[in-house]
């Protein structure tokens, strides 16, 4: 049971629960406070304890008292030490333990459970070996390289930038290109203490946490830095104890279709220790997962999918708690939490920090947490605080001493400002307040703050503590004890030096189980794949149905076997896409030391085996027997064995390509090149005798060629095939002697009426029976080699390095940005060096705002309409149950008022916003009305509102200004001039203080704009639209620091003062922030209203309501939001004294709300409705204007995505050149003609990959459109589809032109036009056909994905359609050979007309010259020359004799003109232009289909039953 029970964060286990650390400088009372102040959720004593703690905190803040010297502190310790006796038992059997230890019981007590585990560990320390881990660093410095010269590459400069970057990488790092992220700093952390890291975004908080967690990939640590983890170096920690020092990122990355319970149980299994007592691994893991879910309020979500921004699942706050629980289960001693409270409501955030405190105090964990918004109650829980300012450390010490340190420095803390906000505000020159008389004494710049700190007595205490710590760990005893504890946790067969808890094979087993659960959560891909293989087996086999055992089936038998091999080989190509979907999660779990990436690689292969078996069975059974291959059990199972091995081999190879690549586009391009090489050199397209010498080696290293050879031998060896066609034959030739004719098939001998299959293989392919089983060993060897390569690459490939949250600009704007930056720095220095005598504090900021007037403020819209709703009820169907999400919610939003929408995570806040704004996509609004001024909502409602979503969803390649301009141009009325829109965009940029990065690209999460900048942009996008009715904001302050959150609230107040109606959800409002709201709508679980009314001054209206209805009094210095959450039972672990939903429904306040709503409905409805047709339009701008603006943005996105465009060109150039030179100057023999025909077939191979490359970009843009732009009526779906179609066409035309030159001339098709002097005309037509093919490629992909939700399924559908097009185009099987049922496919197939046009244009009107292998030999009748004997046959069937006068042996070539060959495949030269026109029509059909299918599948249809 060495695993740290996780309530909260994986606590380090150490010796005695209440023991004071030997190197602790201070205070038994502080340690006691750590243990006691937070012992028990919801107990009666909780209030008394909190009051005592708050009293002590105030004493400390006011007078700097050392609590260890007060009797009161000792009394508190004594009081808490007499709490309920803890049993110290194993809590895994629910029938043998108390309800307080049972996580499935409503009476479960998380802190009691932790204490029980501590006592259990202490009862047998030699067995459990509890561990703890401290940390110290000295002269710590972190730096990055060359950010200032970095810029966003485009198609025009991407290659140059790539070359420059490569040159820099090859050289030693130039110090002039380095910039410091963290300046030199010192610190140390003792087990049992919780440390908070404070600083504004960009100050280095995340970098510090990453450095401590040894997660430094992407930046560098200075050589002078000294870091010690109880005597261990960062390198030792990373190699041997990675999972004991973890970093929890701000973003939440999980498998969206996996349930919460399965996600957490999986993490628990992989950290289940060996020394866990008598309980089984499974029971232990289930119990630990249940404990974390109960602790973090997730028990009710056990069977709910985690979800993500695009897959429906738990709420955003619940998803954040899942991330917290996962880290907790990882069992780390040192936990680095990066803004872990983002998205949590205030009470849940407080409980999370309490849980960390419990884990630290009782289990000796060492948590560090960076928080941007920290309440006073939360701050009081921390032992230490670090304050960072632009990378400088300006304080490190006791949290209770930090405030006084800066007060003594000469700064002033405004009234009602929390300590955390005060400390953070000191790093902002425009926020901090200087005491009178200290104006010229206080430090101003970040460096001055740092110098002041380093010269202080506090710093000397810190350095003394570091020296003492390093001296204590110098003997290595703590290191050895820690390693012994680590080894005791490890399962059997795990290396002691491994950072993992369970063995490799156990990891693999658990991951296999998880993978099956993922398939169960989203079975569509698996079902679609299996179904698709079965359908394709039936379709392909029907093309070659029931081949007869004659020589006429030789070509078709070979073609059928070739397709069977290819279909089995490349069935796994799309696995590359799923690899990249899972990679971020695998990398995260590697950092947590849950499992090796190689274990995930092996497990993914094993878990796919049943799927592959089903796919192989569905395809091969029907295919083998319908084609009428050899009906022999041994032959069939040999065929099935090789097909299965071929699938495995190629799966491993494609996975290896994916593992070595850093992006999907980078993986798919080489995969297609490899695929093309394998197809061409399988042995069918170009038989071995016809392969050119320079590329013959490709066949030797091609595993597919060995499979094809063995299967052909399996089918042909030892069989005699009746001759289907003799030369000469027909008429009088049927009566000639056998010696005077020969079968017209390779391997035939004169005088025989059959052809031996072995001879045919030897003559045509150079295949021999002796290789049949030899090839089995070769293929198995390839499987093993590729498997090893894949596992090794997965284990050691570091993946893509993140650039970090560093703004990237376009190359052309770098000079402007640098100049602006210099001006800003000068301005900042001016502000810092000329501090005014009076600074604006929180308390008077709004007074100043309201007092000053600005002409620019007149730009803000002024509204006068009221939005109100009544009895709003919404439910969704989950399995067989209708779950109510919103329960009869009432309310209104009036112009000039800000209404706060609050509630616990999962209470339905975002759902209510979506319901009010008509953005619901699932479920049913079963009751209620929504009105504007007493009238129902019209078609213009959605564009009349602004909706700031919780997720910051933007196009990564747009700049900030472009994103704002795009919204303004499309959403402001069309009568507003472009100049006015541009001016308003500039105004909003100034209003939101985005000028410094207005020309920066948005980037993706983690790279580009930081969280704060993204949130400002999200708000700005809605503001520039000038919403005339209402502004919704969903968590606008989530993830922001307190100062930025305050500025957002000031902005909302400014908007409200100009008549804007605002409804805003908010999770963690401080007391000061909450006062800026006018009204509050509070929801509890189930979407039930608990309160809707005025807040009043200092929130007194809210407090009076709840106190009037039985709530315990709100302390004067408490945060009303947190107090309210506890009162109504919305905080984890708290219970409401009564049902406040019923209290509300029975209150006088509720009756007043009903009367007000009735008045609005009756009286406002009498007001005239705006009849202006402009205001009632669904979209603000015309469709043609939407089209041009959206098309320009889409083109811009592609231009700024050089990786996508370059991968297209690289794929097309390599494929075309390879194809051209593999069939180099094929000549005009029969085999040469067939080679040229197959070269055209191979020319089509990039189609699938080009579409697969396009799909992620299309889906990404579609998600942005459907999640954000469509609901806000920015532009219509038709403009979106039309822009996607239009943007791709120019790129495809250029691709087609490049492909034409790289392929047409090497193959030598132009030579076929020389005899008729039509080189230019036929070359021009071939160029048109080639470019049309590339345009068709993208049009097909867009049509398929238009109605598909998942890119993988769209790719599968494209593969299915592509294969069907190739099979039914009349070349592999002529119309005469096709079953009658499939003739319609031949007629409706675009490739029929494309291949006929290309064949006739490329091959027509030239002579055939047979090679020696193609010459047929037979004797003429006695007394006749060959010319006399064959004259009648040649005139009827064609062909020519080498020597017409020969009398002993006739040498005959069966064809003399290419037109004869073309006639056999119905490629008529005179129809070439007609066929081209028909193919163009198919492109148009695809485009129309794209529009139709998108409308059919994805455009919401109006519902007559919708009740407004």
From Swiss-Prot:
GO CC terms, sorted: membrane; plasma membrane
Spans within the Extracellular topological domain: 546-559, 630-633, 695-775, 1225-1239, 1310-1326, 1384-1475
Cytoplasmic side: 1-524, 581-608, 655-673, 797-1203, 1261-1288, 1348-1362, 1497-1508
Compositional bias annotation for Basic and acidic residues: 845-860
Listed InterPro entries: AAA+_ATPase (IPR003593), ABC2_TM (IPR013525), ABC_trans_N (IPR029481), ABC_transporter-like_ATP-bd (IPR003439), ABC_transporter-like_CS (IPR017871), ABCG_PDR_1 (IPR034001), ABCG_PDR_2 (IPR034003), Drug-R_PDR/CDR (IPR005285)
ABC transporter domain segment(s): 165-415, 867-1110
Induction: Overexpressed in azole-resistant stains. Fluconazole and farnesol modulate the expression. Expression is down-regulated by 6-shogaol, a dehydrated product of 6-gingerol extracted from ginger (Zingiber officinale).
GO terms of molecular function: ABC-type transporter activity; ATP binding; ATP hydrolysis activity
Record region (Disordered): 1-30, 839-860
Record-listed ATP binding positions: 903-910
Regulation: The bis-benzodioxolylindolinone azoffluxin acts as an inhibitor of the transporter activity. Clorgyline analogs M19 and M25 inhibit the transcporter activity by uncoupling CDR1 ATPase activity from the active transport of substrates. Activity is also inhibited by beauvericin and oligomycin.
PROSITE patterns linked to this entry: ABC_TRANSPORTER_1, ABC_TRANSPORTER_2
Pfam families for this protein: ABC2_membrane (PF01061), ABC_tran (PF00005), ABC_trans_N (PF14510), PDR_CDR (PF06422)
Keywords, ordered alphabetically: ATP-binding, Cell membrane, Membrane, Nucleotide-binding, Repeat, Transmembrane, Transmembrane helix, Transport
Disruption phenotype: Leads to hypersusceptibility to antifungal agents such as fluconazole and posaconazole.
Cellular compartments annotated: Cell membrane
Catalytic activity: fluconazole(in) + ATP + H2O = fluconazole(out) + ADP + phosphate + H(+); itraconazole(in) + ATP + H2O = itraconazole(out) + ADP + phosphate + H(+); voriconazole(in) + ATP + H2O = voriconazole(out) + ADP + phosphate + H(+)
Domain notes: Contains 2 cytoplasmic nucleotide binding domains (NBDs). The N-terminal NBD has ATPase activity. The 2 NBDs are asymmetric and non-exchangeable and the drug efflux by CDR1 involves complex interactions between the two halves of the protein.
Family to which the UniProt record says this protein belongs: Belongs to the ABC transporter superfamily.
Entry function: Pleiotropic ABC efflux transporter that confers resistance to numerous chemicals including itraconazole, fluconazole, voriconazole and posaconazole.
Protein's name according to its UniProt entry: Pleiotropic ABC efflux transporter of multiple drugs CDR1
